[in-house]
Regions:
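Structural recognition of the beta-strand scaffold that forms the well-ordered cores
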Residues: 13-15, 66, 74-77, 96, ...
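Solvent-exposed loop/turn segments at secondary-structure junctions
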Residues: 18-21, 71-72, 81-83, 101-103, ...
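Autoinhibitory propeptides
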Residues: 54-137, 143-146, 320
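Subtilisin-like serine protease catalytic core
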Residues: 94, 133, 143-182, 186-237, ...
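Catalytic-core environment of secreted peptidases
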Residues: 172-179, 327-376, 413
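Hydrolase catalytic cores
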Residues: 225-229, 312, 356-419
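Short acidic, glycine-rich surface-loop motifs adjacent to enzyme active sites
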Residues: 245-278, 301
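Residue-level detector of functionally pivotal "anchor" positions at catalytic/ligand-binding pockets or at interdomain
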Residues: 431-463, 473-474
């Protein structure tokens, strides 16, 4: 019989005063090259957390789970007596309690599992037959970029989520483009096992390709981050996410898609208010803004609380300089559950929308096409679209890619509290400033170009110039 012990588990974020003894820059060669190409200087935020301080914290009996070089601190588990000793140290600025749990543990274990709600309560398969995945890409006018050869090649995408069931075995996901994975949670189950499939569904929207399904950026490379605890909802998960975003920066990823968000928690003492959604208060929002300064494009789901008491967006979706994504249906109508903006400080949120109601996805269990609901699934569509645009404009900065996407949206001049700037047009986003914003004929549709239309035959009523997808003048015979 296994012995058990009733314990109170505490997790804290310990923020340090400075970076004494820090000599190591936490950037890979790839990341360093990206910084040089974009003229982004190395600064103190790129240096490791003080190893001297970390050793001191460990020596007092705390377990260091992970660190944040941007916020300059560490996530630790320990008891109240030890944390009081740590807080009294001169090198400690502030200590934040991030999780307090009570449970029966097998002796020798250091984590507890308490059932919590689903990562995305609206992310459920639905009964009607799914639309062709091509339709949700077409809504973003992404197909012309695909036809021009821009499907995300050369772009590295991270997906931060809560579970990647079968992501390592799904035949529709390109294994040659998989860069790796990292787990920042306390969950002891297998990364690709029973931790849920929410992350895998999101990955499928970006990268899956088979005869009846096409993701948004099937030629991108990708890295998987598990940051969402399976059984609890606490501020510790935001610190997990911050650690993942910093790793993404270290690896030299271009984009991170995050279909997670935080408003209220299992323990009400940690709950945010709408006033907190100002892009500055949460460590997640702070880290997101830093990531943007470091050259990454973060794409974050707005949240599924539009028809609930909370109503507004979550964090880190409130961060500045990112793309927060709302959900619409295939006809462009807002989903009732899509969370409202603006941010508490008045910025337009969400920035853009994509299909998040009846989104076409691949089931990780059997590879069949299914549908799901949630801004969770609109988010990876925008992340994939951004990857295609960036592959077409490889010298562009993250902020230029973001700005092009926003300016191409159909409500850009009249933003809305739920649509934001609206649904982007990726072909237009590519064309702005490149000379390629031209009418075209593609393999998928018949388009009307002034007096030109297709109805069994092509008729031209007046002398117009027609261009193909690459912007080259073509002749109609």
């Amino acid at each position: 019989m296994t012995s058990q012990l009733l314990v109170i588990l505490f997790t804290f974020f310990v923020q340090f005063t400075d970076k004494v003894g820090c000599e190591r820059v936490c950037l890979s060669d790839v990341a360093m090259e990206m910084r040089e190409q974009r003229g982004i200087a190395i600064d103190s935020l790129d240096y490791e957390v003080s190893p001297i301080y970390l050793d001191s914290v460990r020596a007092m009996g705390a377990k260091v789970l992970h660190t944040s070089r941007w916020i300059n601190g560490a996530t630790v588990t320990t008891g109240l007596q030890t944390i009081a000793q740590i807080e009294a140290c001169d090198f400690v600025d502030t200590v934040y309690l991030t999780r307090e749990e009570e449970g029966l543990l097998p002796l020798g274990k250091t984590s507890v599992s308490l059932r919590k709600r689903m990562v995305e309560e609206n992310s459920l398969p639905s009964d009607p037959p799914p639309p062709a995945s091509i339709e949700q890409l077409d809504q973003l006018n992404l197909l012309p970029l695909h036809q021009a050869g821009y499907r995300g090649k050369g772009i590295r995408i991270g997906v931060a989520d809560g579970g990647f069931y079968n992501a390592n075995t799904m035949s529709a996901l390109p294994k040659a483009q998989w860069l790796g994975y990292a787990d920042f949670t306390d969950d002891e189950d297998d990364f690709f096992g029973s931790s849920g499939n929410h992350g895998t569904l999101c990955v499928s929207a970006i990268l899956a390709s088979q005869s009846d399904y096409e993701g948004a950026a099937v030629e991108a490379e990708y890295f998987l981050f598990r940051t969402e605890e399976q059984y609890t909802e606490s501020p510790k998960e935001l610190d997990n996410w911050v650690a993942a975003i910093e790793m993404a920066d270290s690896l030299g990823l271009h984009i991170v898609s995050t279909s997670l968000g935080y408003t209220t928690f299992d323990d009400e003492q940690f709950d945010f208010t709408y006033a907190d959604m100002d892009g500055r208060l949460s460590r997640g929002a702070q880290a997101a803004a830093i990531a943007a300064r470091k050259g990454m494009l973060l794409v974050v789901a707005a949240g599924n609380d539009g028809n609930k008491a909370w109503h507004y967006l979550s964090t880190p979706a409130d961060a500045d300089s990112i793309l927060t994504v709302g959900a619409v249906d295939i006809d462009g109508e807002i989903a009732a559950f899509s969370s409202f903006g603006p941010s508490a400080d008045g910025r337009v949120k969400p920035e853009v929308c994509a299909v998040g109601k009846q989104t076409s996805l691949l089931n990780p269990s059997d590879g069949w096409v299914m549908t799901g609901n949630g801004t969770s699934f609109a988010c990876p569509l925008i992340a994939g679209a951004a990857a295609c645009l960036w592959s077409a404009l490889p010298t562009a900065s993250n902020m230029e890619i973001r700005e092009r996407i926003i300016r191409s949206a159909d409500r850009y001049t009249t933003p809305h509290e739920q649509y934001g700037y609206g649904i982007p047009d990726l072909w237009e986003a590519y064309g702005k400033g490149t000379g390629n914003n031209l009418p075209y004929v593609d393999d998928y549709h018949a388009y009307e170009v002034e007096k030109i239309w297709y109805n069994g035959q092509l008729f031209i009523k007046k002398n117009n110039t027609l261009y193909n997808i690459l912007g080259t003048n073509i002749t109609i015979h």
